[in-house]
Amino acid sequence: MANLRDIRKKIGSVKNTQKITHAMKLVSTSKLRKAEEVARNSRAYALKLDAVFDDVLSKMKNQGIEDIQSKYFRELERLEIKKVDIIFITADKGLCGGFNTNTIKKVLACTNEYKEKDIKVRLRGIGKKGNEYFSFNGIEVLDKINNLSSMPNYERAQEFMKKVVEDYLSGKTDKVIIIHNGFKNMISQEIRVKTILPIGYKIIHQNPQPNETQETITSEPSGSEDEILDSLAEKYVEYSLYYALIDSLAAEHSARMQAMDTATNNAKDLVKTLTISYNKARQEAITTELVEINAGVEALK
């Protein structure tokens, strides 16, 4: 009977877990819808920012201004890279499947790839899970910040990028990339790697949906060409990180929703299996008791 009690306890425990995972799935689904809407609106802004870059550069080209002196811009094919900063974004919480693991694996792969080319790599981390992993494994992370990937904030992202931009402009790094797990759709995510500094001409023109941003600049901005580009570049870099944070959060909710759905289904299957085991054990116990009763009756005859 002790075995039956143990199985009953397990069934009760699994059912409680099932209720929790189902509730977490519903919460993640609700949060995902909101995050998806924010990501969609933010993407529209990012596309318009790209369109502004395109328009400014095309106007400069039409005016015969080919030599851009701004340090934010480089022809990537001619650029010699010796130092790279990798900004990675992970979640502050777990229970989201391979969301964090996949990002960390990509960071490690990129780091090894650069090191094989004798390129120095520095890491800058956003998100508790990633920062904890690298700290535990003795891998240095230059800048760490938590509670930003779970609550994207433009001012905090802007503050984080100030040091990054300062290091780039002062020559402490030649290239800055962002690695994060991005939202693809309700049931899938994808690892995204984006170079944000320097801003190469190909990066500016990489947008595959030009029809979404056909508006052009109609007024002539004041200031030199490089001042205009520097001002736009600062916004571009800051918003690139902010959009990556929003995109990552939507992907995180998507991954957690899937993970909790899988956990709920697994709990259902486990309850069925345990129930079958319980019924078998109960039947065996009843059979054993009947045999013992019959044996006792026979002994009294």
UniProtKB/Swiss-Prot annotation:
Membrane protein topology class: Peripheral membrane protein
Keywords: ATP synthesis, Cell inner membrane, Cell membrane, CF(1), Hydrogen ion transport, Ion transport, Membrane, Transport
A GO BP annotation: proton motive force-driven plasma membrane ATP synthesis
GO cellular component: plasma membrane; proton-transporting ATP synthase complex
InterPro entries referenced in this protein's UniProt entry, alphabetically: ATP_synth_F1_ATPase_gsu, ATP_synth_F1_gsu
Cellular localization per UniProt: Cell inner membrane
Gene Ontology MF: a single term: ATP binding
Task performed by this protein: Produces ATP from ADP in the presence of a proton gradient across the membrane. The gamma chain is believed to be important in regulating ATPase activity and the flow of protons through the CF(0) complex.
Assembly mode: F-type ATPases have 2 components, CF(1) - the catalytic core - and CF(0) - the membrane proton channel. CF(1) has five subunits: alpha(3), beta(3), gamma(1), delta(1), epsilon(1). CF(0) has three main subunits: a, b and c.
Family, per entry: Belongs to the ATPase gamma chain family.
The protein's name in its UniProt record: ATP synthase gamma chain
Organism: Helicobacter pylori (strain Shi470)
